[in-house]
Amino acid sequence: MSQSLHLTTRGSVLEIILDRPKANAIDAKTSHEMGEVFMRFRDDPSLRVAIITGAGERFFCAGWDLKAAAEGEAPDADFGAGGFAGLTELFDLNKPVIAAINGYAFGGGFELALAADMIICSDNASFALPEAQLGIVPDSGGVLRLPKRLPPAIVNEMLMTGRRMNAQEALRWGIANRVVSATELMDSARELADQIANSAPLAVAALKEIYRATSELSIEEGYKLMRSGVLKYYPRVLHSEDALEGPLAFAEKRSPEWKGR
């Protein structure tokens, strides 16, 4: 792996640190590498949760590397599997990703955070989509995901002016799960990751699948889809060894031993 990504495995949790000069910005090469990492995470049955953060204390990720852009890298460059940063278009990822925001998450950095399942941020975190001021648009998910998280007036202001949102505002609007001090950030992210990793992995995969497949449906339509047999993980949960193990472990007052099947 390149010097831009530092990977650590802690039990069933994969930790990814983005470490690039000039604000942890991402060029096409780094994006390809991140896509490879997230696909390996997806396909490795020993891994259940990933945490992604940025190196240093100021920047989570400043988004697309504008130096690379100035040198000729096009906005519609091939950013590899999973889209920009390897995650923004990785729609078949059945495992949760936690973004630990250690500072500025601007442009594609905010889009990367929005593609994660949960966000823990330090109290100095800041979020923005300044693309319109650069003559481009946040087309790596920002213009698509932000309207699903915030009221239209707030979305329009952030998209059209590049207005920054601080950590407390992100918490208030539900963008962030929690805000902690910078020194507590990784401990808080790891605590959350461990809690998720203690859940049955097949059930977690089914939850992601159901949420993704039914979020735009009515409750009635969602029920019909769940019972239609077209989902991949939900039917497997119903007839899994883990579905037997959970109640048995509860009755025997012991920790369950998940098999993922």
Curated annotation (Swiss-Prot):
Name the keywords, alphabetized.
Answer: Lyase
Per the record, the pathway is:
Amine and polyamine metabolism; carnitine metabolism
GO biological process: any one? carnitine metabolic process
Q: What is its EC number?
A: 4.2.1.149
Q: Which InterPro entries match?
A: Carnitinyl_CoA_dehydratase, ClpP/crotonase-like_dom_sf, Enoyl-CoA_hyd/isom_CS, Enoyl-CoA_hydra/iso, Enoyl-CoA_hydra_C
GO MF annotations in UniProt: hydro-lyase activity; L-carnitine CoA-transferase activity
What reaction does this enzyme carry out catalytically?
(R)-carnitinyl-CoA = crotonobetainyl-CoA + H2O
Q: What would be one Pfam family of this protein?
A: ECH_1
User: What does UniProt list as catalytic?
Assistant: E111, E131
- Which CDD domains does the annotation name? crotonase-like
EC class (word): lyase
- Family label: Belongs to the enoyl-CoA hydratase/isomerase family.
- State how it assembles: Homotrimer.
Explain the purpose of this protein.
Answer: Catalyzes the reversible dehydration of L-carnitinyl-CoA to crotonobetainyl-CoA.
- Indicate what this protein is called per its UniProt record: Carnitinyl-CoA dehydratase
Give the source lineage, highest ranks first.
Bacteria, Pseudomonadati, Pseudomonadota, Gammaproteobacteria, Enterobacterales
Q: Coding gene?
A: caiD
